[in-house]
Structure formats: structure tokens, C-alpha cells
Amino acid sequence: MSDDLNLEELKRRLKEGDYLEISTGGGAYEVWAEPYATPPAVYFEGEQHPIAELDGIAQRIMDEMHRGEIRCRWVEDD
């Protein structure tokens, strides 16, 4: 997936409620945003962050993916 994912698409899909699964050497976790929650938040590495941090988190994901440190895939609804 890394070849067809860009920063803007990553931010857009997270804001739209899609879940991104990140696989590392030590396991996997999901990233998602809840822009309409109170307070609006993004969930990353098992922690809740203010939605204002979404751009920085998305950039970090892209950087780590391009360095080959993580693999990503969108979680599909069954």
C-alpha cells in the first residue's frame, strides 16, 4: 500500500473515519480519528491526541513508512 498512499489521502481518510493498521517489527496497532467527538481526537500508538495533531501524526506515519520502519493498510469493513 505504501506506493499508492500520499499525505493528503492519509489525512482525508482518517478524518472521514477510516482505520489505518500499522505493522511494526514488534506488532500492530490501529490509527483513527474522531473529528466530531467531544473533544475531537486522533488515536495513535494507543493514546488519544488532540485532533490538531493529526497533520503531524500523518507526517510521522509517512516518514516512518518511507524509511521502511512500518507497513500500513486500511482496515476494511467486513
Q: Each predicted region: which residue ranges?
A:
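N-terminal acidic leader/helix
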Residues: 3-29
